[in-house]
Amino acid sequence: VPLPPVREKVRVTASFPYRYYLNYCTYSYSMAFWDWEQWEKEIDRMALQGINMPLMAVYSQYAVWQNTLRRLNFSEDDIRKFLPGAGYEAWWLMGNLEGFGGPVTPEFIARQTDLQQKMLKRMRELGMKPVFQGFYGMVPNALKEKFPDARIKDQGIWGTYQRPAFLDPTDPLFDKLAAIYYEEQK
């Protein structure tokens, strides 16, 4: 159904300079299988509502982590064991599980990356400044085998899921890994 015509210009000024939108769970529970057509409409609605800082952390994380782990000489099998399936990204990025619902295919990662690039382009065209996931120390449990002297903490189980490990931020490996992660995120 087409929208009715706008009879007169409407202008509303926001009270706050930063207007953040979305969270990890929304991406995983509601938007995990959205395509570009759905996202384009959502991004346009964001702009109409004055959103200027949308969360843009989920789709690109597959490629960021895949490439980061490749640079640390992880096997493709170990990388696939770390990346979760679609719909589980929120729990993964919040440090609750690793690999569940996977493995994801290279084609899936490429599609997610392409979708994210389109989303970013549109958001930036509309003056938004997307918010990305930062590196906070969550790492695959398999990192302990690659770097046995690093201070990597086992986080145990969450429900019935194996949680990712946590790299101590005071360990020298933290800065090295963060630098690789941010290079890959560009």
Locate predicted features.
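Aromatic-lined carbohydrate-binding surfaces of glycoside hydrolases
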Residues: 6-186
